[in-house]
C-alpha cells in the first residue's frame, strides 16, 4: 500500500487521491455483507453518505480528466479493506501484536533491501523527523489493527470513522501550516463529524442485532 501511495501521488493531485482513498468504507460495507454476514442498518448508510460528501467538500477535487492512476488508488483502498476483513474474520489466529509484526516484517525486509541497493544520505534533522513519523505511523497501524481485530459485530460502523482523519488533517494544517479552509470545506468538516456521530448508534444497532 505505501508503494501505491507514492506512485499515485506522483501522478495525481492530493485532493483527488484523498477522495478516492475514502472509498474504502464503501468497500467495507459490501465485504461486511458478503464475508462477515453483518446486518447493515440505516445509520451506517447515513454515516457513509455524510462522510463521503464531507470529504468531497473538504478536498474539492478537480477530476477534470480521467487518469489511469485513479484506478490504482481504488485498488489500494480495496486492498486496505481486504486486510481489515482478514483481521476481523481471523481475530483468534494470533494477538494484535502478532498481526502487527507479521504484516510489517515483509515490508521492512523489502525496504532494507532497496536501501542497500540505493542508500540515501540525509541530515540528522531529516532522520529525526523520519524516525518520529515512523513511530506515529506504526502506532496508528497497531491501534487500527487492534480496533478491526476486536470489532466483531460492528466492523462496518467502525470503518466509517476513517473519515475523521480528514478533520484531523485540516486542524493540523491550520495550526502548523496556516492552511485555512473556505466555507464549503468547513461544511464538509461538519458532515465528517456528523458521520462519526452516526456511527455510534450504528454500532449499538449492530450489537443488538
Question: Residue spans of the language-model regions?
Answer:
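Loop-to-transmembrane-helix transition segments
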Residues: 1-4, 68-76, 115, 120-140
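Specific transmembrane alpha-helical segments of multi-pass solute transporters/efflux pumps
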Residues: 1-15, 135-152
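Membrane-interface helix-cap regions at the ends of transmembrane helices
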Residues: 3, 53-64, 107-128, 174-178, ...
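Hydrophobic/small/kink-forming positions within alpha-helical transmembrane segments
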Residues: 3, 25-30, 55, 78-82, ...
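C-terminal transmembrane-helix exit sites in multi-pass transporters
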Residues: 5-7, 24-46, 165-186
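Helix-helix packing/entry segments at the starts of transmembrane helices
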Residues: 18-23, 90-105, 142-174
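Hydrophobic transmembrane alpha-helices of multi-pass small-molecule transport proteins
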Residues: 43-60, 184-203
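Transmembrane alpha-helical segments that form core, pore/gating elements
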Residues: 65-122
